[in-house]
Swiss-Prot record:
Cellular location(s): Cytoplasm
Annotated GO CC locations: HslUV protease complex
Full protein name: ATP-dependent protease ATPase subunit HslU
Protein keywords: ATP-binding, Chaperone, Cytoplasm, Nucleotide-binding, Stress response
GO molecular function, one term: ATP hydrolysis activity
Assembly information from the UniProt record: A double ring-shaped homohexamer of HslV is capped on each side by a ring-shaped HslU homohexamer. The assembly of the HslU/HslV complex is dependent on binding of ATP.
NCBIfam families, sorted: hslU, PRK05201.1
A GO biological process held by the record: proteolysis involved in protein catabolic process
Organism: Yersinia enterocolitica serotype O:8 / biotype 1B (strain NCTC 13174 / 8081)
The family this protein is said to belong to: Belongs to the ClpX chaperone family. HslU subfamily.
Database matches in Gene3D superfamilies: 1.10.8.60, DNA helicase RuvA subunit, C-terminal domain (1.10.8.10), P-loop containing nucleotide triphosphate hydrolases (3.40.50.300)
Function text: ATPase subunit of a proteasome-like degradation complex; this subunit has chaperone activity. The binding of ATP and its subsequent hydrolysis by HslU are essential for unfolding of protein substrates subsequently hydrolyzed by HslV. HslU recognizes the N-terminal part of its protein substrates and unfolds these before they are guided to HslV for hydrolysis.
Gene name of the record: hslU
Lineage: superkingdom: Bacteria
Length: 443
């Protein structure tokens, strides 16, 4: 798991997300508390439960982006789910328990990757020996078994040197490689994905792992053999246990669009995709044991971060029990013109940098002036104010409209330089921004 301090986490998030300091601080503290808890003695560690977070703010202000970036920083099992995908147990649709199953699958994949990386050096040695055995077959004894010699022959050593220097990369060899598992496509109704996964695993295990001769270049064979040998060095049962421990101690679940499962007004009949889902989430957030194909997983110490726009509902519309299990509330602010201007220039791989790089592939140099960027930010803010406020996502729409002519003609404009200043932006956007009907349907 990550050992970054809260200040380091916020600094890293600042590289991608503009503003929203309160939300960044909250997730940074929550992430650091995961590390702090692991430093306690076992008895006290069991008593310290995570303080779950509810992020509240209009659409397009950075809630989901914080989750995306946090997933990369956490170095822990992480999953992002949409609350609207689930229904109450017993109805058609995904059950909330599948969140923990998917989180465990992600953890197994993560732990397997880490284990393979640790074994890579040994796997490279074994892969090298297998390729050399094909190039220079070892001498065999009277029983047809390879003879065990104390020292490799000079010829083998010479080929080993060439192999390491890449001189044999393009040479084709025929070698036995693990055959791809038999694919069994099973169509299942919504909510039955777990059953189909188990059936597919069963059919693959019946087929077994077979070796199949393939004619392939040494460079490609080396990569495949490394993966194959590394997989042999990993203990599957130990790997599963490590993954379950990682989920139970460090797992993070981000539930997006939680406001969409709030009950609005008085409705008759069962509310299976709203209040029913909230009731099903309660035991997960409070702590329960979920059965997965890898084993039983306890959710007592999994951190839950929920987010929602709450534009047509409020956090108080959540059932009281769920409100109590999300004790930390963070409100994200709507974005201003200054924020839009910073979003266009400051983040790593900002939108303007992306468009410049895309046009550079056609040999077209695009430059954005400071006044031009300010004008784009003002246009996006005005459209947000006069129509639906979709936050920073409006910048994508405005920029795409602004760059439409340049993108269309770029293939025939090799070597040209284009400067996007306030006048250029005004020429292409002023009419659309001024006309409310046009901006509503086009921007």
């Amino acid at each position: 798991m990550s050992e970054m301090t809260p200040r380091e986490i916020v600094s890293e998030l600042d590289s991608y997300i503009i503003g929203q300091d309160k939300a960044k601080r909250a997730v940074a503290i929550a992430l650091r508390n995961r590390w702090r808890r692991m430093q306690l003695n076992e008895e006290l560690r069991h008593e310290v439960t995570p303080k779950n977070i509810l992020m509240i703010g209009p659409t397009g202000v950075g809630k989901t982006e914080i989750a995306r970036r946090l997933a990369k920083l956490a170095n822990a099992p992480f999953i992002k789910v949409e609350a609207t995908k689930f229904t109450e147990v017993g109805y058609v649709g995904k059950e909330v328990d599948s969140i923990i199953r998917d989180l465990t699958d992600a953890a197994v994949k993560m732990v397997r990757h880490q284990s393979i990386e640790k074994m890579r050096y040994r796997a490279e040695e074994l892969a090298e020996e297998r390729i050399l055995d094909v190039l220079i077959p070892p001498a065999k004894n009277n029983w047809g078994q390879p003879e065990e010699t104390q020292e490799p022959s000079p010829t083998r050593q010479a080929f080993r040197k060439k192999l390491r220097e890449g001189q044999l990369d393009d040479k084709e060899i025929e070698i036995d490689l693990a055959a791809a598992p038999v694919g069994v496509e099973i169509m299942a109704p919504p909510g039955m994905e777990e059953m189909t996964n188990q059936l597919q695993s069963m059919f693959q295990n019946i087929a077994g792992q077979k070796q199949k001769p393939r004619k392939i270049k040494i460079k490609e064979a080396f990569k495949l053999l490394i993966e194959e040998e590394a997989a042999k060095l990993v203990n599957p049962e130990e790997l599963k246990q490590q993954a379950i421990d990682a989920v139970e101690q460090h797992g993070i679940v981000f539930i997006d669009e939680i406001d969409k499962i709030c009950k609005r007004g008085q409705t008759s009949g069962p509310d299976v995709s709203r209040e029913g889902v909230q009731r099903d989430l309660l035991p997960l957030v409070e702590g329960c044991t979920v059965s997965t194909k890898h084993g039983m997983v306890k959710t007592d110490h999994i951190l839950f971060i929920a987010s929602g726009a709450f534009q047509v509902s409020s956090p108080s519309d959540l059932i009281p029990e769920l409100q109590g299990r999300l004790p930390i509330r963070v409100e994200l602010q709507a974005l201003t013109t200054d924020d839009f201007e910073r979003i266009l220039t400051e983040p790593s791989a900002s939108l303007t940098e992306q468009y410049k790089a895309l046009m550079a592939t056609e040999g077209v140099t695009v430059e954005f002036t400071r006044e031009g960027i300010r004008k784009i930010a003002e246009a996006a803010w005005q459209v947000n104010e006069r129509t639906e406020n979709i936050g920073a996502r409006r910048l994508h729409t405005v920029l795409e409209r602004l760059m439409e002519d340049i993108s269309y003609d770029a293939s025939e404009s090799n070597g040209q330089s284009i400067t996007i200043d306030a006048a250029y932006v005004g020429k292409h956007l002023d009419e659309l921004v001024a006309d409310e009907d046009l901006s509503r349907f086009i921007l």
